[in-house]
A protein has these predicted regions:
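Long, intrinsically disordered, charge-dense linkers/tails
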Residues: 1-222
Length: 222
């Protein structure tokens, strides 16, 4: 057993929300714990938001399903407009149990989408975390940059495998391309996002394989 000073310890309340990142008081019967006593001993009662975020990122790195208390605490911090919550935006930080994996906020939507295995409707058990999900970018429907991200997911996967995009994934690719085109016409896509498309194998050649745009132009000019 390891001994610590009180100031190095965290109270065991909802410890699963941050367990990998802190020394937690080894006392499981929390109902018998007196908060006043813990405070007198300089034990930290509530974990810092950064600690909970770091634990979630640890779960992402190890592929472990985070305990529901992790999202509960972050949801409470989102309701208080904690600025650190926004640091999760754009990262794979939401665990979808049906997929046994983490997805980005722009792969989850409040209403059903026709984007196959690349986007999902919010599962019923996660709807209670709406303040958190809204704060990190979960929306009702995809926007231009979301279509770009999903399109890059598709071509990145198939480019590595040197395989043509086919079947339902091809339908999703086409839908994303249309979504990007419509957003571009509305001038909703910035230059940096366009550059991401230009630098990736985003165009399908005659065989349906992802190809870099400049290579397609070279082939067409020959």
């Amino acid at each position: 057993e390891n001994w610590h000073s009180g100031s190095d310890l965290y109270a065991p309340y909802r410890a699963e929300a941050f367990r990998s990142q802190a020394n937690i008081l080894d006392f499981r019967n929390t109902a018998r714990l007196k908060t006043e006593l813990l405070e007198d001993l300089d034990v930290t009662i509530n974990p810092e938001t950064r600690l909970v975020i770091d634990h979630l990122q640890y779960c992402v790195k190890t592929g472990a399903q985070p305990h529901v208390s992790t999202y509960q605490v972050l949801n409470e911090r989102a309701q208080r407009s904690d600025p650190l919550i926004s640091t999760l935006a754009g990262s794979r930080c939401i665990y979808v149990e049906s997929q046994k994996s983490f997805v980005r906020p722009n792969q989850l939507y409040w209403s059903p989408q026709q984007l196959g295995r690349y986007a999902f409707t919010i599962p019923g058990n996660l709807e209670v975390f709406k303040p958190l999900f809204t704060a990190i970018g979960v929306k009702d429907a995809p926007e231009g940059r979301d279509y770009v991200d999903i399109l890059l997911d598709i071509v990145g996967e198939y480019f590595v495998q040197s395989k043509p995009v086919a079947g339902s994934d091809r339908s999703v690719y086409d839908a994303c391309l249309m979504g990007v085109s419509a957003a571009d016409e509305r001038e909703e896509i910035g230059a940096s996002t366009i550059r991401r498309l230009q630098e990736a194998p985003t165009i399908l050649n005659l065989m349906g394989q992802p190809t870099h745009p400049d290579e397609v132009l070279l082939q067409d000019s020959e």
